[in-house]
A protein has these predicted regions:
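N-terminal helix-rich module
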Residues: 1, 9-39, 43, 51, ...
Length: 213
């Protein structure tokens, strides 16, 4: 009987640590999803022969707002009167490819005026993220905070372009992205950041890695 009681006491004592580990694991899983989205974009660009653009926003915080939205768009011919058939790949990040400036609403795969289609995405505004106070911050080259909006585009030839802001894409030909993008996935408790921060490091090759600290 004493042994049973001791086991019960030890199990109860372990609950807080197990709960913390579970929440940290959820944040890590979110970081994996974000990292894989960039790898998917790089792979699709080479495999499909089309430009692939990731639109990202995270102006929110642990308390709420947009905790992190990442959408993968593929450049495609969308108009029937084009020289190429509808659905044909568009291989350039700049003109004549037109990218959406804002994230698509749930259930939407097209954007007005854009020559691109939404093919995948990661939305960190779910019930679990809200409950566990998980959110992301985006840091561009030079340590500049870009949570209000940023865009990264991969071409089939291996070039990567990047632009920041929420006013729309502005990929300039001949000026490929240099440096790295960092997306930190963290969590809070009572509004105070706690636990392990998972940082998704995105170089211009698109070969992401996750740093935990």
């Amino acid at each position: 009987m004493v042994v049973v009681i001791l086991i019960g006491v030890l199990a109860v004592m372990a609950i807080p640590a197990m709960t913390t580990a579970q929440i940290d694991r959820r944040a890590y899983n979110d970081a994996i999803l974000v990292a894989e989205l960039f790898r998917e974009a790089r792979t699709r660009a080479m495999g499909r022969g089309s430009a692939e653009m990731i639109l990202m926003t995270s102006p929110g915080s642990a308390a709420g707002g947009d905790r992190g939205t990442f959408q993968l768009w593929e450049g495609q011919v969308m108009a029937a009167l084009s020289i190429l058939p509808v659905g044909s790949p568009m291989s350039t990040c700049g003109f004549p490819t037109v990218w959406p400036a804002l994230a698509a609403t749930p259930g939407t795969v097209l954007a007005a005026g854009a020559t691109a289609q939404l093919v995948d995405g990661v939305n960190l505004n779910g019930t679990i993220e809200s409950q566990d106070q998980i959110w992301t911050t985006i840091t561009g080259p030079g340590g500049v905070n870009m949570s209000s909006g940023a865009y990264m585009c991969f071409t089939p030839l291996g070039r990567t372009y990047f632009t920041a802001g929420n006013g729309g894409t502005n990929f300039v030909s001949g000026t490929p992205f240099l440096g790295e993008l960092q997306i930190s996935v963290q969590r809070a408790l009572g509004g105070v950041q706690v636990g392990i921060t998972r940082t998704v490091v995105v170089p211009n090759s698109g070969a992401t890695r996750i740093v935990s600290k």
